[in-house]
């Protein structure tokens, strides 16, 4: 996943900013200042001075009914903390879960190649000129989608900005005649003529990792290694706990406090010392994504995890041919999976979560497969979202060990160090 050069320069100029981006919400949220991070870690569920740009939903017919319509359109689950409960000065994006709110912030950051404080004041509540302009742009995007696409999120910030603060008007000829830039399609696709049958690709994958019988005998594993955050410079210890068929917990012991990502088979959470909500409930597409991540850890049930499987024509990643499959989760969110044509192993997953301003992508690239109890397990993967990336490298994996049920329970709020 390519990150804008301006954004990279900002990150690598200081280890603090690099760390904050690295521990941004797995939902795709933006980073935050140390002042705001410390306040959120001690304030529990009290409102914090975040005051981020408050975008409207693309399919929303008007701003006056913003709160009620947001809840109705997203089917916001009961009991989860909403954006206006967590943050101050939320003017538009009310009635939606915090993880969707943060995913939308991440989309703004990715589209403009900007970090938080390039739009926000240090206290995050003030209406800066860029925030005011952004609200006008949101209304413009909503009008375009409502007028031309029946409210569907066809046009987004990324459509025009592409990591620039101002959309280009005139095509530069050195770009027109230069090396073409390939943008992977993020739309749903149908079964392509001439593409392999999805079951054929999935069966080869199951066989490549060791076969159904060996997968059934691998009931759990515990991995240990290191995690490198976006920007580099240091590595943090990491622990991964997996229990078949669909429980997974990852703990990254970061310098300023642990980050814990857990899926217990039904619900998912993120706990971090430097996020605006100490323990974030995963909802919607982010919950579907956490479920897929857990199932892929011991992938014996992959065919059943996603439905409506279809195959596109083969593509390539890093010079290797890959088969491209797409499936849809029960919640309606989709994921695209890339399998190495020669080995049959899973190379990449790109999964999507709907948000107020479009789909929030999460990309996981797998490598360094090694046998664990007869099953090939990736010992290296990168986990990238719209405002950060972790690269995890395992040094040891212990198979079929007893794991306490508490490892998959809702994590306690992280304690800042």
Q: For the regions a protein language model found, what residue spans apply to each?
A:
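Primarily the internal scaffold of c-type cytochrome electron-transfer domains
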Residues: 66-67, 71, 75-77, 85, ...
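Gly/Pro-enriched, hydrophobic low-complexity segments
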Residues: 254-257, 318-415
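N-terminal secretory signal peptides that target proteins for export/translocation
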Residues: 1-11
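N-terminal mature ectodomain segment of secretory-pathway/periplasmic proteins
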Residues: 203-276, 306-313
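Acidic/charged, solvent-exposed loop-and-adjacent secondary-structure segments enriched in E/D, K/R, S/T
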Residues: 270-297
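The canonical Cys-X-X-Cys-His
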Residues: 113-123, 154-164
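Signal peptide processing junction and immediate N-terminal pro/mature segment
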Residues: 24-52, 56-69
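Mature N-terminal segment immediately following signal peptide/propeptide cleavage
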Residues: 77-114, 118, 198-225
């Amino acid at each position: 996943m390519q990150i804008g050069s301006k954004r990279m320069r900002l990150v690598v100029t200081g280890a603090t900013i690099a760390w904050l981006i690295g521990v941004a919400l797995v939902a795709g949220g933006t980073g935050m200042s140390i002042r705001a991070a410390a306040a959120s870690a001690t304030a529990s569920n009290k409102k914090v001075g975040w005051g981020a740009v408050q975008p409207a939903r693309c399919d929303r017919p008007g701003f006056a009914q913003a709160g009620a319509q947001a809840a109705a359109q997203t089917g916001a689950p009961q009991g989860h903390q909403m954006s206006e409960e967590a943050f101050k000065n939320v003017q538009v994006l009310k009635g939606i879960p915090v993880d969707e709110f943060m995913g939308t912030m991440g989309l703004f950051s990715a589209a403009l190649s900007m970090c938080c404080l390039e739009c926000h004041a240090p206290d995050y509540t003030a209406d800066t000129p860029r925030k005011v302009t952004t609200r006008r742009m949101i209304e413009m995007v909503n009008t375009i989608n409502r007028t031309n696409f029946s409210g569907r999120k066809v046009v987004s910030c990324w459509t025009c900005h592409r990591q620039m603060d101002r959309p280009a008007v005139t095509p530069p000829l050195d770009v027109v005649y230069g090396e073409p830039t390939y943008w992977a399609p993020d739309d749903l696709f149908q079964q392509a003529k001439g593409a392999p049958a999805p079951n054929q690709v999935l069966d080869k994958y199951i066989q490549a990792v060791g076969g159904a019988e060996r997968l059934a005998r691998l009931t759990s594993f515990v991995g240990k290694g290191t995690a490198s955050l976006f920007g580099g410079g240091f590595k943090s210890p990491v622990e991964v706990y997996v229990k078949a068929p669909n429980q997974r917990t990852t703990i990254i012991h970061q310098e300023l406090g642990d980050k814990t990502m857990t899926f217990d088979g039904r619900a998912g959470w993120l706990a971090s010392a430097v996020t605006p909500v100490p323990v974030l409930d995963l909802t919607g597409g982010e919950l579907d994504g956490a479920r897929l991540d857990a199932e892929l850890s011991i992938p014996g049930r992959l065919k059943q995890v996603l439905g409506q499987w279809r195959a596109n024509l083969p593509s390539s990643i890093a010079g290797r041919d890959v088969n491209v499959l797409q499936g849809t989760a029960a919640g309606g969110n989709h994921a695209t999976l890339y399998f190495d044509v020669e080995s049959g192993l899973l190379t990449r997953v790109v999964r999507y979560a709907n948000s107020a301003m479009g789909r929030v992508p999460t990309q996981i690239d797998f490598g360094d497969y090694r046998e664990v109890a007869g099953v090939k397990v990736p010992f290296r993967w990168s986990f990238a979202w719209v405002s950060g990336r972790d690269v995890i490298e395992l040094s040891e994996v212990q198979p079929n060990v007893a794991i306490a049920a508490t490892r998959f329970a809702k994590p306690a709020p992280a304690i800042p160090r």
